[in-house]
UniProtKB/Swiss-Prot annotation:
Involved in DNA repair and RecF pathway recombination. This is DNA repair protein RecO. One of its GO terms (biological process) is double-strand break repair. The keyword DNA repair applies. The lineage of its organism: Bacteria, Bacillati, Cyanobacteriota, Cyanophyceae, Synechococcales. It comes from Prochlorococcus marinus (strain MIT 9303). The gene is recO. GO terms for cellular component: bacterial nucleoid. It comes from the Bacteria. Keywords: DNA damage, DNA recombination, DNA repair. InterPro entries: ARFGAP/RecO, DNA_rep/recomb_RecO_N, NA-bd_OB-fold, RecO, RecO_C. It holds the Pfam family RecO_N. PANTHER family: DNA REPAIR PROTEIN RECO (PTHR33991:SF1). Belongs to the RecO family.
Amino acid sequence: MSGERRLNGLSLKVGPLGEHDRLLTLLSDQEGVTRLAVPGARRPRSSLAAAVPLSLLELQVAGRRGLARVRQLKVLRSFNSVGKQLETLAAAQALAELSLMLVAGNDPLPGLLNTLLMHLERLEALSQAQPAQPNTTLACSVQACVHLLALGGYGLPVQECCRNGTALEPPLGQWEWRCSLMPEEGFAIGALPGAALQLNPSELALLQRLLRPALPMRRDGELMGPPEVWLRLLAVVECWIRTHLPHHMRALGMLREAIISSGDGRT
């Protein structure tokens, strides 16, 4: 059949399509976000029934006009274990949702798939942790959003003041110092009217460290920052996404509720 091709990618979203088929939304390095029909995937014992969310798939696809169809499917890796904990499930759904918002149709975003897979691997490990580590899950989620936003061209401008260009160098120990999040502009030095949020020096320093590959850890191996600080940084990310991207992210709200319900977040 004309237009046959092989695609490797992560299933971000799967929904019903007619009575027996599924609609698969795939993120790949080759094509960005692609929507594909998976014929018969809702039938019992279908060979294509493995088309489920958060799975790394190898697909044989036919057709280039209209809605292409999946002819063969192989699961390379499944991240369904993130569903063992509500916090890791909400976090994984949030990352999938954000990735969909960042990719403009069939325009690939270099590095996005690998970065998303890296953070899903971290969430997968946290989903199996005993006892549960909701604060670390929250921190991983905030950092993952920071990384994905930067790749998508919507990075948080945490290096200089948006009003005068002065370097944002938080004076640790000066607790009266404040930095204001101005949703349309970025971060400005001082407690300014119209700010969505204000951060103290340690909160800004923690946010700046999220640009690095690893989470910020203390010398004793424990995560830096208490739950209430990570919830504030989540609010920063939520505000930035709400202002600069076209859709509200429901999954981040679910994550916030799950963290607070776990008792590891205080308001």
